[in-house]
Amino acid sequence: MDGLTAAESRELDQRLQKRQVKEFMSVFGNLVDNCFTACVDDFTSKALSGRESGCISRCVLKSMSTQTRLGERFGELNAAMTAEMQRR
Protein backbone atom coordinates (compact mmCIF):
# COMPACT_ATOMS: atom_id res chain seq x y z
CA MET A 1 0.00 0.00 0.00
CA ASP A 2 1.37 3.38 -0.97
CA GLY A 3 2.68 5.55 1.86
CA LEU A 4 2.39 2.88 4.55
CA THR A 5 5.17 1.24 6.50
CA ALA A 6 5.36 -2.54 6.52
CA ALA A 7 3.86 -2.63 10.03
CA GLU A 8 1.01 -0.32 9.02
CA SER A 9 0.34 -2.40 5.94
CA ARG A 10 0.19 -5.60 8.04
CA GLU A 11 -2.16 -3.93 10.53
CA LEU A 12 -4.42 -2.72 7.71
CA ASP A 13 -4.45 -6.22 6.18
CA GLN A 14 -5.39 -7.72 9.54
CA ARG A 15 -8.21 -5.22 10.00
CA LEU A 16 -9.52 -5.91 6.50
CA GLN A 17 -9.41 -9.66 7.09
CA LYS A 18 -11.25 -9.24 10.39
CA ARG A 19 -13.90 -7.12 8.69
CA GLN A 20 -14.32 -9.67 5.90
CA VAL A 21 -14.82 -12.46 8.45
CA LYS A 22 -17.45 -10.36 10.27
CA GLU A 23 -19.25 -9.62 7.01
CA PHE A 24 -19.16 -13.30 6.00
CA MET A 25 -20.53 -14.35 9.39
CA SER A 26 -23.30 -11.77 9.08
CA VAL A 27 -24.29 -12.99 5.61
CA PHE A 28 -24.11 -16.62 6.77
CA GLY A 29 -26.17 -15.87 9.89
CA ASN A 30 -28.81 -14.12 7.81
CA LEU A 31 -28.89 -17.05 5.37
CA VAL A 32 -29.38 -19.56 8.18
CA ASP A 33 -32.05 -17.43 9.84
CA ASN A 34 -33.96 -16.76 6.62
CA CYS A 35 -33.91 -20.35 5.39
CA PHE A 36 -34.73 -21.79 8.81
CA THR A 37 -37.64 -19.40 9.26
CA ALA A 38 -38.96 -20.05 5.75
CA CYS A 39 -38.55 -23.82 5.75
CA VAL A 40 -38.67 -25.35 9.22
CA ASP A 41 -42.05 -25.50 10.89
CA ASP A 42 -42.31 -28.97 12.42
CA PHE A 43 -40.58 -29.21 15.78
CA THR A 44 -41.99 -32.62 16.73
CA SER A 45 -38.90 -34.42 15.40
CA LYS A 46 -35.15 -33.86 15.60
CA ALA A 47 -34.79 -34.70 11.92
CA LEU A 48 -35.82 -32.51 9.03
CA SER A 49 -38.70 -33.76 6.94
CA GLY A 50 -38.13 -34.32 3.24
CA ARG A 51 -40.09 -31.17 2.45
CA GLU A 52 -38.04 -29.11 4.92
CA SER A 53 -34.77 -30.49 3.61
CA GLY A 54 -35.72 -29.72 0.00
CA CYS A 55 -36.89 -26.25 0.97
CA ILE A 56 -33.61 -25.51 2.75
CA SER A 57 -31.59 -26.76 -0.24
CA ARG A 58 -33.54 -24.51 -2.62
CA CYS A 59 -33.33 -21.56 -0.22
CA VAL A 60 -29.55 -21.87 0.18
CA LEU A 61 -29.03 -22.31 -3.57
CA LYS A 62 -31.18 -19.27 -4.33
CA SER A 63 -29.36 -17.17 -1.71
CA MET A 64 -25.94 -18.21 -2.98
CA SER A 65 -26.94 -17.48 -6.57
CA THR A 66 -28.15 -14.06 -5.49
CA GLN A 67 -24.91 -13.34 -3.61
CA THR A 68 -22.88 -14.46 -6.62
CA ARG A 69 -24.84 -12.20 -8.97
CA LEU A 70 -24.55 -9.26 -6.57
CA GLY A 71 -20.79 -9.78 -6.41
CA GLU A 72 -20.58 -9.89 -10.20
CA ARG A 73 -22.67 -6.75 -10.52
CA PHE A 74 -20.58 -4.85 -7.97
CA GLY A 75 -17.48 -5.91 -9.90
CA GLU A 76 -19.01 -4.61 -13.13
CA LEU A 77 -19.93 -1.31 -11.51
CA ASN A 78 -16.48 -0.97 -9.96
CA ALA A 79 -14.82 -1.61 -13.32
CA ALA A 80 -17.06 0.97 -14.99
CA MET A 81 -16.34 3.58 -12.30
CA THR A 82 -12.60 2.88 -12.51
CA ALA A 83 -12.67 3.25 -16.30
CA GLU A 84 -14.63 6.49 -16.00
CA MET A 85 -12.14 7.91 -13.50
CA GLN A 86 -9.21 6.99 -15.75
CA ARG A 87 -10.81 8.82 -18.68
CA ARG A 88 -10.90 12.06 -16.70
UniProtKB/Swiss-Prot annotation:
Disulfide bonds join C35-C59, C39-C55. The keyword Thylakoid does not apply. It comes from the Eukaryota. A motif (Twin CX3C motif) lies at residues 35-59. It is found in: Mitochondrion inner membrane. The twin CX3C motif contains 4 conserved Cys residues that form 2 disulfide bonds in the mitochondrial intermembrane space. However, during the transit of tim9 from cytoplasm into mitochondrion, the Cys residues probably coordinate zinc, thereby preventing folding and allowing its transfer across mitochondrial outer membrane. PANTHER family: MITOCHONDRIAL IMPORT INNER MEMBRANE TRANSLOCASE SUBUNIT TIM9B. This is Mitochondrial import inner membrane translocase subunit tim9. It comes from Neurospora crassa (strain ATCC 24698 / 74-OR23-1A / CBS 708.71 / DSM 1257 / FGSC 987). The lineage of its organism: Eukaryota, Fungi, Dikarya, Ascomycota, Pezizomycotina.
